[in-house]
């Protein structure tokens, strides 16, 4: 781990993050928010970690344990008291936090859409027959093959800059990147956003999750709470409940998004077969004033609808959940 940004004044908080440019940008956003919300009473020492997932640059996460590979080192340091806070991209966080840890804030969600990048095409439909798509995401692979089964898929791993470089080197004709990450890095213009209705994102995509221990003092918890954005917090609860019910990991193509429909929330979720040959979708709605418990029930109900429909085809859903 590496100290990136020493505290400038106020009570010191050790804020853990991955060391990629995107992760550091997110950590600085949270650190700045804490300084502002506490009027300088708290300051942050940003501590960067190289996680197991960062070290796996050539293979899919599914082959190395799935979710948690980008959070495990941070989780352990937080549990040992070496960190006060950990900042994560929510889509990388397992559906159940380690014992003794809680979410303290969900800042305003950035663009949740996936972005399409290619030097010769404006959309996946424009790619030539048999074109090569670079991705390490089972979800994106399945969704792309559902639209274009003729595409060839090669594994693309690495941070945003690495994947853009691989595309530039001609290792693939196209790739996908989260618009949230591109926007936070000031690179949104390099990609074409894909409508949510056409390509549902990963649960929690575009949301930052701030995690702390459950014994944190109430003063700090109140300050962190000021960083939260209520619609983003609501979406995080519903989408993660959907994911937890499905026992979601990197082993199954799963997508979910909570849509604002004016006077109600609508959760749409989907599971795809590997390769995208079959897609199962479910949806449900709840009132805007729904409690956290009702949001959890919404997520679980939509997941159960899919489990019932898909259990004959996908053995992972064959047991009762």
UniProtKB/Swiss-Prot annotation:
**Sequence positions bearing S-(dipyrrolylmethanemethyl)cysteine:** 250
Stated EC number for the protein is: 2.5.1.61
Gene3D superfamilies for this protein = Periplasmic binding protein-like II, Porphobilinogen deaminase, C-terminal domain
**Highest taxon of source:** Bacteria
Q: Does the keyword Transferase apply?
A: yes
| Obligatory cofactor(s) | dipyrromethane
Provide the GO MF annotations for this entry: hydroxymethylbilane synthase activity
GO BP, one annotated term: protoporphyrinogen IX biosynthetic process
The record's remark on the cofactor is: Binds 1 dipyrromethane group covalently.
Per the record, the pathway is: Porphyrin-containing compound metabolism; protoporphyrin-IX biosynthesis; coproporphyrinogen-III from 5-aminolevulinate: step 2/4
Q: Which Pfam family is one of those matched by this entry?
A: Porphobil_deamC
Q: Which InterPro entries match?
A: HemC, Porphobilin_deaminase_cofac_BS, Porphobilin_deaminase_N, Porphobilinogen_deaminase_C, Porphobilinogen_deaminase_C_sf
What's the name of the protein?
Porphobilinogen deaminase
* Gene for this chain: hemC
């Amino acid at each position: 781990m590496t100290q990136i940004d020493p505290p400038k004044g106020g009570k010191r908080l050790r804020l853990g993050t991955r060391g990629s440019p995107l992760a550091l940008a997110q950590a600085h956003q949270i650190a700045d928010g804490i300084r502002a919300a506490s009027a300088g009473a708290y300051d942050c020492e940003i501590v960067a970690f190289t996680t197991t997932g960062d070290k796996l640059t050539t293979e899919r996460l599914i082959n190395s344990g799935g979710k948690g590979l980008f959070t495990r080192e941070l989780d352990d340091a937080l549990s040992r008291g070496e960190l006060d806070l950990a900042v994560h991209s929510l889509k990388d966080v397992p559906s159940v936090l380690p014992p003794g840890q809680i979410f303290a804030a969900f800042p305003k969600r950035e663009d949740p859409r996936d972005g399409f990048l290619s030097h010769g095409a404006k959309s996946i439909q424009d790619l030539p027959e048999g074109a090569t798509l670079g991705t390490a995401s089972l979800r994106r692979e399945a969704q792309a093959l559902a639209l274009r089964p003729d595409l060839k898929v090669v594994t693309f791993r690495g941070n945003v800059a690495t994947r853009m470089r691989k595309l530039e080197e001609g290792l693939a004709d196209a790739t996908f990147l989260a618009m949230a990450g591109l926007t936070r890095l000031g690179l949104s213009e390099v990609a074409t956003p894909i409508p949510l209705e056409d390509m549902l994102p990963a649960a929690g995509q575009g949301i930052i999750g701030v995690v702390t221990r459950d014994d944190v003092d109430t003063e700090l918890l109140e300050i962190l709470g000021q960083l939260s954005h209520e619609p983003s917090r609501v979406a995080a609860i519903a989408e993660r409940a959907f994911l937890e019910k499905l026992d979601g990991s990197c082993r199954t193509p799963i997508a979910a998004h909570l849509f604002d429909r004016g006077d109600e929330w609508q959760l749409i979720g989907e599971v795809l077969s590997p390769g995208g040959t079959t897609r199962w979708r479910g949806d449900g709605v709840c009132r805007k004033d729904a409690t956290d418990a009702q949001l959890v029930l919404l997520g679980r109900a939509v997941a159960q609808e899919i489990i019932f429909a898909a259990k004959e085809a996908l053995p992972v859903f064959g047991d009762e959940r």
